[in-house]
């Protein structure tokens, strides 16, 4: 488990730190995501910078109203699987949003620390949560879902269609997804380049 610093003023002692970019000579040889992944201690240190605001502007600014301070606290404590569970309660594709969502204009832009201390690296921590949880074998718990026997057709296997399918499955409904392309993902697969979003994330 990552060690959590006991200093409640860590946002002063530890500045905002984004993941490092891969070396240029390495980026020239491959067409994959350009940022190195966060290490456990890095993610814990950055998550612990969160002030846990009583009225979290980051959460309000988020289009899906993610429980951002809550899962940042879990990451700071090293509880990655619980953070993944919480993250998936409000977001069907957090592993994608952590990579492509414009956090600088949304959650991070609204962070209380943004003026003066540098916003918490919310997007990078969100990416760390899902990548680490999946690597640990975590999958959403569907054991309590009761099948309804109903089926719903969804036209389009892009992010909206996939998100809709996820919500239906959690409600016990079987989604039947139709798309003109042979692969799922829509814009995620055919529009966003791999240096921003590797296609393996969707598999």
Where do the language-model regions lie?
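Fold-independent oxyanion-binding glycine-rich loops
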Residues: 114, 125, 157, 180-181
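Gly/Ser/Thr-rich beta-alpha loop segments that engage phosphate groups in nucleotides
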Residues: 160-163, 187-188, 193
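N-terminal glycine-rich dinucleotide-binding loop that anchors FAD/FMN and/or NAD(P) in oxidoreductases
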Residues: 120, 191-203
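Glycine-rich FAD pyrophosphate-binding loop
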Residues: 173-189
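Residue-level detector of alpha-helix initiation sites
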Residues: 92, 158-159, 183
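Ferredoxin-type iron-sulfur electron-transfer modules and their immediate structural context
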Residues: 1-151
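Generic beta-strand/beta-sheet core signal
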Residues: 53, 155, 178-180
